[in-house]
Structures are given as C-alpha cells and as structure tokens.
Amino acid sequence: MFWDSIPVPKGTHADFAVAVTDDSLAPWIKKGGTAYLRRNTELYDGDVGLFETDAGIVFRQFCADCRGTVYLFAVNRAHAQDDCMIPPDKAASLVCYGRLELKKPIPLPMD
C-alpha cells in the first residue's frame, strides 16, 4: 500500500496521515481533509481504523462481540451497505494499518 507522505503536526499522537479522497468519514472528516492515524495500537469498540478488506483499503468503525466476530461499520451511514462482518475464524488475519486519531469518539451505529 502506498500513499503520499503528509506531514503530521507536532504535538499529536499520530504516526502518519492520509488524504481523505471520498465522503467515507463524513461528517467528521470531509472529502479533501486529512486523517491522522496511529500505528500498533489496540482497537476498542467504536474506534475507527484503516483496514485492508476484500473491498480494498478502507476506513471502518470497529466492533467485536463476545464470540470474536468483528463488525466493520461504514462511518458515513449513507454507506451502511458497505458494513461487513468477519467471522471469528478469519478475524485474526484482519489487517489494520492504524487507528484514526479524533478529538471525540464517533458513536457506534444504532441501525
């Protein structure tokens, strides 16, 4: 995976940044904005990560149930059809490049 190097401001916890080229993170980060990410950090329910999935490399909101099933929700609920479920036997191979650093958490979808 390759992307243009975007400088990360000092004083942030981010390790790298990527340009947001669509509305997948709206309304929190708009198209044309910058997403700041932190590598090698544990994900908790509600965290947004940059994942490698069958659909490509995408931003998704993470949630795992007590059985080990992982749910990756589209942050922009206009794209709810892009939500995916990863069964426990495949969840261990899920690749996350980093957790999105935000000032406020994004609520998990209720639909």
What feature does the model see in each segment?
Residues 1-5:
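Extended boundary segments
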Residues 8-111:
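Acidic/glycine-rich C-terminal interaction modules and beta/coil loop segments
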